[in-house]
Amino acid sequence: MDAFATSPTSALIKAVNCIAHVTPMAGEDSSENRRASNYKPSTWDYEFLQSLATSHNTVQEKHMKMAEKLKEEVKSMIKGQMEPVAKLELINIVQRLGLKYRFESEIKEELFSLYKDGTDAWWVDNLHATALRFRLLRENGIFVPQDVFETFKDKSGKFKSQLCKDVRGLLSLYEASYLGWEGEDLLDEAKKFSTTNLNNVKESISSNTLGRLVKHALNLPLHWSAARYEARWFIDEYEKEENVNPNLLKYAKLDFNIVQSIHQGELGNLARWWVETGLDKLSFVRNTLMQNFMWGCAMVFEPQYGKVRDAAVKQASLIAMVDDVYDVYGSLEELEIFTDIVDRWDITGIDKLPRNISMILLTMFNTANQIGYDLLRDRGFNGIPHIAQAWATLCKKYLKEAKWYHSGYKPTLEEYLENGLVSISFVLSLVTAYLQTETLENLTYESAAYVNSVPPLVRYSGLLNRLYNDLGTSSAEIARGDTLKSIQCYMTQTGATEEAAREHIKGLVHEAWKGMNKCLFEQTPFAEPFVGFNVNTVRGSQFFYQHGDGYAVTESWTKDLSLSVLIHPIPLNEED
């Protein structure tokens, strides 16, 4: 189906209409001229996914009413009188349950009140309180200096040895240390100290609850976790606690299921779109719709951003296919033609491409133009030039990597990363999300062009996404014949072993996070939710690539989480 069959956007840009006859290039179907991608077929049943559009988990009206009532109760809890440490712990639980977005203003108001409180006796000698206060304030945009931890060091400048026995304090210090900036050496020391000591005691912690929290944190710190994924885990964990607040737990479950129901409807519509494009029948490229929807929920899960998710998932699904064309399937001549067409944003010359590649190209054009039309209709802003520019820049980066491969050129790590932080493709998703969410008073041609120029916040996001991708996919992609990745570039450049190269890249990840953390506090033309989109795309990558390539290959851990986050609602007690 042509997205522009009846669209008025043709006045803005030449409409892309379905082409009845695409002249195939000689040898189009000749497998000996193509490298094999060896991708496994999708394990998801697309008929089932499509059915979610109409038969998804419908939340009962009584549960909606109950959720509204409980929401007011939780709001009263947050604003109620209690000891400062208890207030911090409540806010921490609310956030981990995935409810921060429901109480954003109340949480910030309470935290600011605690920040302005001149009394420090309640936290200054309490490692848990100091670290929890530090993390929650920084997470919510209130700067706290690192030297609040100086009081926990001895005369020699090291963390006091007796802190090794304070497991809860160590855990809070560990989580706080991940919000550090470049140059904050004390937080680097805190990260090393807490990590070492938590690893030493993790198997001997007497409290089962605390032990599980420690192991979970060592596997993935909170600051690197996607909120929606973390909420699903923590709801189950919170239910096991001795001092669980039953109404808070009930509200978390209800809200999770309500949002899940909305996501299911979106996923069903996207699955239908995907099947209608016909691209699901192309065997030489990845079919990644489900993974991309999970990624979309990591980027932004809140119900009001359905259009952002829809555009992000469609673009990401097409990006995966275009990436495969450049990396594996297309000849250099075809890639030159493809890039030129995208750069001109004009399909003249498409008849020089094979039918399979033309289908992908036309779907890309139609989808981008439809997103542009929706922006014009809903926001009165022509976003097509900016979306087209992002696609063109991405394809040029892909082409450079293809030329490296075909010529046998081996880039330095720095050269590779400069290209790779854009070729990882998230600039396109971020540009589109910016166009969809920036306030109309601030949305201008110049501001959108600035996002496309890859400013520092977007740059750190791209760099981290690239590094995580390479750590998880490097070996498999080299086996498929892809261009060298950062690990191989470093090995070639320095003579390091693969193990040493991986450690170096992991070090770059930590440093890039520090840069990202600082960007969150610097003066910037960006505001929420766009700032959050940049951080959250990285958290999605961290999840998919932490144990290998959970994106290209649907591994057990990604499928299990997808089922629990998107398909299966959280069971409620019978009285609920």
Curated annotation (Swiss-Prot):
Binds 3 Mg(2+) or Mn(2+) ions per subunit. Its EC number is 4.2.3.-. GO terms for biological process: diterpenoid biosynthetic process. Its cofactor is Mg(2+); Mn(2+). (2E,6E)-farnesyl diphosphate binds at residues 286, 323, 327, 466, 469. Keywords: Lyase, Magnesium, Manganese, Metal-binding. Mg(2+) 2 binds at residues 323, 327. Mg(2+) 3 binds at residues 469, 473, 477. Pfam families: Terpene_synth (PF01397), Terpene_synth_C (PF03936). A motif (DDXXD motif) lies at residues 323-327. One of its GO terms (molecular function) is terpene synthase activity. Coiled coil: none annotated. CDD domains: Terpene_cyclase_plant_C1. Mg(2+) 1 binds at residues 323, 327. The Asp-Asp-Xaa-Xaa-Asp/Glu (DDXXD/E) motif is important for the catalytic activity, presumably through binding to Mg(2+). Belongs to the terpene synthase family. Tpsb subfamily. Produces almost exclusively beta-bisabolene and only traces of alpha-bisabolol from (2E,6E)-farnesyl diphosphate in fragrance biosynthesis. This is Beta-bisabolene synthase. It comes from Santalum austrocaledonicum (Sandalwood).
